[in-house]
From Swiss-Prot:
Residue numbers binding Zn(2+): C297, C302, H304, C310
Subunit structure: Monomer. Associates with 30S ribosomal subunit, binds 16S rRNA.
Subcellular location, record wording: Cytoplasm
Gene3D superfamilies with a match to the protein in the record: Nucleic acid-binding proteins, P-loop containing nucleotide triphosphate hydrolases, Probable gtpase engc, domain 3
Binding site for GTP: N160, K161, I162, D163, G214, Q215, S216, G217, V218, G219, K220, S221, S222
Domain of life of the organism encoding this protein: Bacteria
Domain CP-type G: start-end pairs: 104-273
Protein name: Small ribosomal subunit biogenesis GTPase RsgA
Organism: Shigella flexneri
Source organism phylogeny: Bacteria, Pseudomonadati, Pseudomonadota, Gammaproteobacteria, Enterobacterales
Residue spans crossing the bilayer: none
Gene name tied to this protein: rsgA
């Protein structure tokens, strides 16, 4: 990881956090500053409890404690940390994370108990992995795309297992993927088994921090293992060889480096993005091809369904918007309403 010089704004934030920590430490003792060396730059490659693994500028990984004044720390955060000094009895003291730089982006997911929960930071792009088996679901792809648009993180759609397609199947799948190509999304067709299409994907990942999203069974872990060039798999397979059905993993989010350049954060928290915390207007904005027609409906409170004078529905009827996308839009709204109803019912039970 290259060592970046702090900007004036970043330095001010680090100093402000440090002063806030010093103020808090007067009220309640934190860690002894004499136990730690000089501040350095680093990136969080994994977080668990009150500890984090921080990679320094020279590529070494250090186990660190986290200052109590740091309110949020996730994999991908760029931090100021200090190494621990050797203790008198020869045991090394853990390092300490002192401050967190401002995030360029934050990947969040809704949580019934904690509201919106951050799971990764400074993501450049989300790689949406789908596959023809167990089944190709455009509805799930559309859910991921809405999440990406809401988070303002660039998506790439990757269709895996293309080696299982014959010519007729490939033509059909390409027709489905053209729906997304035509509205500006990048689509890559790959096979982690034969490694077809991996070179363009590797090029798209170079120099960027990515996170792979996909349901169990799409071959996400196999794809990551192929890209990482691992001799021994360190990412748990997300599909059972015997049944063909997906199985869950419980590992914490962790950042890995691609040999061709670029990084990936592997996290079990992005198998499926919940959208129930969003408002219907945010879902509408999440369909990029709707933008040209928003505000053109006859009624301001148009639900974009059977309402008379709906500009979006008319665009669908004229073939300007894909019917499958329009149908999935309403499926997402319906599923959101159902989840919110269950959540409200559960809250009243408490």
């Amino acid at each position: 990881m290259s060592k970046n010089k702090l900007s004036k704004g970043q330095q001010r934030r680090v100093n402000a956090n440090h002063q806030r920590r010093l103020k808090t430490s007067k009220e309640k003792p934190d860690y002894d500053d004499n136990l730690f060396g000089e501040p350095d730059e680093g990136i969080v490659i994994s977080r668990f409890g009150m500890h984090a693994d921080v990679e320094s500028a020279d590529g070494d990984v250090h186990r660190c404690n986290i200052r109590r004044t740091i309110r949020s720390l996730v994999t991908g955060d760029r931090v100021v940390w200090r190494p621990g000094k050797p203790a008198a009895e020869g045991v090394n003291v853990k390092g300490i994370v002192e401050a967190v730089h401002e995030r360029t982006s934050v990947l969040t997911r809704p949580d019934f108990y904690d509201g919106v929960k951050p799971i990764a930071a400074n993501i450049d792009q989300i790689v949406i992995v789908s596959a023809i088996l167990p089944e190709l679901s455009l509805n799930i792809i559309d859910r991921y795309l809405v999440a990406c648009e809401t988070l303002q993180i660039e998506p790439i759609i990757v269709l895996n297992k293309i080696d299982l397609l014959d010519d007729e199947g490939m033509a059909f799948v390409n027709e489905q993927m053209d729906i997304y190509r035509n509205i500006g999304y990048r689509v890559l067709m790959v096979s982690s088994h034969t490694q077809d299409g991996l070179k363009p994907l590797a090029e798209a990942l170079t120099g960027r921090i990515s996170i792979f999203a996909g349901q169990s069974g799409v071959g996400k872990s196999s794809l990551l293992n192929a890209l990482l060039g691992l001799q021994k798999e360190i990412l748990t397979n997300d599909v059972s060889d015997n049944s063909g059905l997906g199985q869950h993993t419980t590992t914490a989010a962790r950042l890995y480096h691609f040999p061709h350049g670029g990084d990936v954060i592997d996290s079990p928290g992005v198998r499926e993005f919940g959208l129930w915390h969003l408002e219907p207007e945010q879902i509408t904005q999440g369909f990029v091809e709707f933008h040209d027609y928003l505000g053109l409906c006859k009624y301001r409170d148009c639900k974009h369904d059977t309402d008379p004078g709906c500009a979006i529905r008319e665009a669908v009827e004229e073939g300007k918007i894909a019917e499958t996308r329009f149908e999935n839009y309403h499926r997402i709204l319906e599923s959101m309403a159902q989840v919110k109803t269950r959540k409200n019912f559960s809250d009243t039970d408490d």
